[in-house]
Amino acid sequence: MSIETLLEAARFLEWQAQQQQRAREEQERLRLEREREREQEQKRASNLARLAHALPVEEPRIEAPPLPLSPPAPPPAPPPPLATPAPLTVIPIPVVTNSPQSLPPPPPLPPAAQPLPLAPRQPALVSTPGLSIKEPVTLPTRPQVPTPAPLLPDAKTTVAPTGSPKPLQPLPAPILTIAPHPGVQPQLAPQQPPPPTLGTLKLAPAEEAKSSEQKKRPGGIGTREVHNKLEKNRRAHLKECFETLKRNIPNVDDKKTSNLSVLRTALRYIQSLKRKEKEYEHEMERLAREKIATQQRLAELKHELSQWMDVLEIDRVLRQTGQPEDDQASTSTASEGEDNVDEEMEGDRAGLGPPKLNHRPQPELLKSALPTPSTAPAPLPTHPHPHPHPVALSPAHLPVQQQQPPQQKTPLPAPPPPPATPTQTLVPAPAHLVATAGGGSTVIAHTATTHASVIQTVNHVLQGPGGKHIAHIAPSAPSPAVQLAPATPPIGHITVHPATLNHVAHLGSQLPLYPQPVAVSQPVAVSHIAHTLSHQQVNGTAGLGPPATVMAKPAVGAQVVHHPQLVGQTVLNPVTMVTMPSFPVSTLKLA
């Protein structure tokens, strides 16, 4: 039971005890009042009997008119009980009024003896002082009646009307003595049952409390079950939380662990993580400060470098720093005894400036800023030639068109052109370097004239997939051949021309260039082959030797173009530049 129910029960018991005590007091007071009323009625009856025998009948008729004036007196009667001296004179008036009011009913009894009942009217007024003297005994009881309980004023009020409205019942004096008793008794009868009603009222709340307790008990049982379920769920949730915490904490024994130990280890682990976080923050701050200092130092060094170092030296330093990468990117040469050519190339490079090409990292060819494969071809600045006459074309600038019909599989020999072919345009001294417009790769082959059949080939192809080209070059052979076997993508342009690199090599006429058939094989098609040999004659003659053979073998057809061999005095590093689109793997073989 809760505290509220206990308090309610205690209050109910106290209230029940008080009600019982009040009921007892009321019963005692009612009993005393009934006894006093009986005594008063007996006294009144005896007084009336005495007055009836002593007074005549006519006098009360004369005094009858003033009697109606007396009824206004009863209304002030209720308040006077509070003051003891005033009611002594006022209260007897109702007694007088009772007697005259009780007289009107006597007319039905005139034959018996009217003077007897009418006589008391006058003596009532006469005997009022006597009554007032006798009734002080009852007056002290009346003021006590209204004060103790609320039921007493009810009884008194009922008694007062018995004197005023119910005087009809007591006709003669003896009847008056008898009538008040039944009038008082019926009042007592209903007054006595109220205590049992109080008891019933007392019992009713007790039953209601019991019923409410009984109603609360099943509700309490339900709430207890709900509470148990909630407690079970809470414990399960806590257990799950501890399990997850245990899994997240390292170095925790699974067997002997309590919740307290898990919490302690978790606290230690969290503290260690916080310490590590602070250390990492300090480390990051230190690194940031070092980075700022390093950047400032770098800026200072750059400023100092720009003050005491000119542009040429900076370019040279950059070229030296970039040289290892160029050496690694370039392929090895298969020629023998080419040190002098390398020295000449390095001298030319130093004279013309640093190389600045991304797609063609050969230092020998980077004399000027060449465009990337996606740009248009740009002319190479060459050494001006003293002779105004045009360059003799050893092989004419013959384009080889692609043959679409597959039926033409036999090589079609072309007549050897004269030293100067009028049908083809002459290539001027500044030769043009042809680059593919499709972003293709480039194969550059240098031909050195130190030996008749020694060719220095630098094969460096920059392409998307990242494949490499293999360059195989064999020294002197009677008929060396350059064989290009790329993958499926077609070759854009093949241009063979000697580049004038500000260097003139004086060679003897006894060094002929042997006939060199060049075979270019490709599975798809050869779009354009331009084989140009432009030569500048200086103090010598150019003789035409046996013709070399250029064989183009596409998948759908073939053409054979013969060109005479060039034998002259001044041949400067003929450059074979093969420009082709990107393809995965190809082989450049010179055998």
UniProtKB/Swiss-Prot annotation:
- Bias (Acidic residues) ranges: 336-346
Q: Residue spans with biased composition (Low complexity)?
A: 390-411
Question: Which gene carries the instructions for this protein?
Answer: Mnt
Compositionally biased region (Pro residues): 63-84, 102-120, 374-383, 412-421
Its biological purpose: Binds DNA as a heterodimer with MAX and represses transcription. Binds to the canonical E box sequence 5'-CACGTG-3' and, with higher affinity, to 5'-CACGCG-3'.
The family database entries (SUPFAM superfamilies) matched by this protein are listed as: HLH, helix-loop-helix DNA-binding domain
Annotated stretches, region: Disordered = 17-122, 182-223, 321-426
Residues with N-acetylserine modification: 2
Q: Where is the composition biased (Basic and acidic residues)?
A: 22-44, 205-216
Q: Where in the cell is it found?
A: Nucleus
The record ties this protein, via PANTHER family, to: MAX DIMERIZATION, MAD, MAX-BINDING PROTEIN MNT
Record's keyword annotation contains Repressor = yes
Q: What does the annotation say about its assembly with partners?
A: Efficient DNA binding requires dimerization with another bHLH protein. Binds DNA as a homodimer or a heterodimer with MAX.
Q: Name the Gene Ontology biological process terms.
A: cellular senescence; negative regulation of apoptotic signaling pathway; regulation of cell cycle; regulation of DNA-templated transcription
Q: Which UniProt keywords apply?
A: Acetylation, DNA-binding, Nucleus, Repressor, Transcription, Transcription regulation
Q: Which residues form the bHLH domain?
A: 222-273
Q: What is this protein called?
A: Max-binding protein MNT
Origin species: Mus musculus (Mouse)
